[in-house]
Amino acid sequence: MNEEFNKTLKSAETEDWLDLHVVRPFCYWWAVLFAKFDIHPNTVTIWSMIIGAAAAIFFGCGSWYYSGTWGLWMNIIAILLLCLADIFDCTDGQLARMTGKKSRLGRILYGVAGFVWFLPIYHALVYRFFLHHDIEFAWLGIENNETNTWIATLVAWALGWISGLAGLAAQQRLADYYIQVHLFFLKGEKGSEVDNSRQQQETYDKMTKDTPLVERVFQKSYIDYTKKQENKTPEFQRLMAKLREKYGSTDNIPQEFRDEFRRLSLPVIKWNGLLTFNFRSAWLFLFCLLDLPVLYFLWEIVGMGLLTWYVNHRHETFCRQLADKL
């Protein structure tokens, strides 16, 4: 199995320990099963979106402190559903590499899957806070009346939006980009999925009215996705521009330079792994089980925000140093 399993991975270097030793082997057997039934990777991604979004219903109802065993089971079901959604989200890529069924739409769906999960989940957590907030009000010394409940819920909703847009969306977008960048220097252009907004805009411009509306909408959103990745990494963009200027094509980048980039990138990738699903969701599960779901928003904004800044700072620093040497 090892050889066949390894072929379905992008690279062991970009997987954290839990993914490499637990999640990915499990996903491999799912991929084998789906391949036997000729199920397309994009179908698996869509299943992942539906399952992850469905977890929101149970997160919104789950509360051990307020609802006893029933609420605890709602939390557990929500956690299991979100974990299953992540397993399917990992399986789609392994299935695509196993069967060769890769597509531009698949790459775009992969990029938005997490947002489809967490958008309803975050709203469900705000609704849960609206129903159950005695602990937080007691801590803050707030009188538990209807007016204060609505005010606090609006604050929680605002925190949820900040957490989702400035937190989850921005953090996972950057984490995904750094994984693809590392793969680019490790395996070359064919071994990675580093996209740039200019090429994606050209792809969109070539679409006609006969192109399915869904595909055009996803492609348009993917242009914005890649632009935000580029805007967050100016030193890396400068490095790539200097490499193209010096070598004419990224295919001509010397192996010695690729090895040096990989050496500098590898320690950052280890930290970058904390921005992906496993570490992030562990905190979500913890705060929900503690019946303090809104505190997760604060953690994602502050704690995960500082971690994202650190990863971005380290990556941009060594990119600037490499660019200055060219």
Task: For every predicted segment, state its role.
Residues A56-S63, I121-R128, C288, V311, ...:
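Structural signal for membrane-spanning alpha-helices in multi-pass inner-membrane proteins
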Residues M1-F26, Q180-L326:
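C-terminal membrane-associated helical module and adjoining short loops/tails
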Residues N2-P25, W29-F37, D86-H133, L168-Q171:
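Cytosolic-side membrane-entry/anchor segment at the start of a transmembrane helix
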Residues W30, I51-A56, P120-A124, F279-F287:
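Hydrophobic, membrane-inserted alpha-helices
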Residues C83-C90, L165-H182, G305-T317:
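Transmembrane alpha-helical segments that form the membrane-embedded catalytic/substrate-channel core
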Residues V126, L131, E143-H182:
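Alpha-helical transmembrane segments
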Residues P41-L105, F118-Y122, T153, W157-A166:
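Membrane-embedded alpha-helical segments that form the functional core of polytopic membrane enzymes
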Residues P41-M49, Y110-F118, I269-N278:
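Select subsegments of transmembrane alpha-helices in polytopic membrane proteins
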